[in-house]
Amino acid sequence: RRYERRALEEAIQIYPEAVIATPGGLVSDAATFNLLLAHCTTVWLRASPGDHMQRVAAQGDVRPMAASREAMDDLKRILAGRAAFYSKAEIELDTSVKPLEATFADLRAKVRGALRLPL
């Protein structure tokens, strides 16, 4: 987690207007998560546990399913445990059961609105 924080600090300093995709577990380190909240426009791309699992499998990563028969229950617990942290994001967008194009259009509109940019 220390390396994640250092990478985030560096990214914020060097690229103040960049889009930074962080790992979901970043919220487990309060200092790193607070750094993100203080310096960035934050977006929670929320998805159902089923969609999370499908997306991981679609990337060819079957480890979550192979490691445990209770993988879905584990994923639900992880997401529920992080939800209070994720909800601190300025923007929240549910990406479940949405085509990519519609999700992107919604995301673009929400971010431009938050940054007070013309749509």
What are these regions (language model features)?
Residues 80-119:
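NTP-dependent small-molecule kinase module
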Residues 38-83:
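A glycine- and Lys/Arg-enriched "phosphate-lid" helix/loop adjacent to the NTP-binding pocket
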Residues 1-37, 85:
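ATP-dependent small-molecule kinase phosphotransfer cores
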Residues 24-26, 48-50, 98:
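Short glycine-rich anion-binding loops that position phosphate/pyrophosphate groups of nucleotides
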Residues 17, 40, 90:
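Conserved acidic residues
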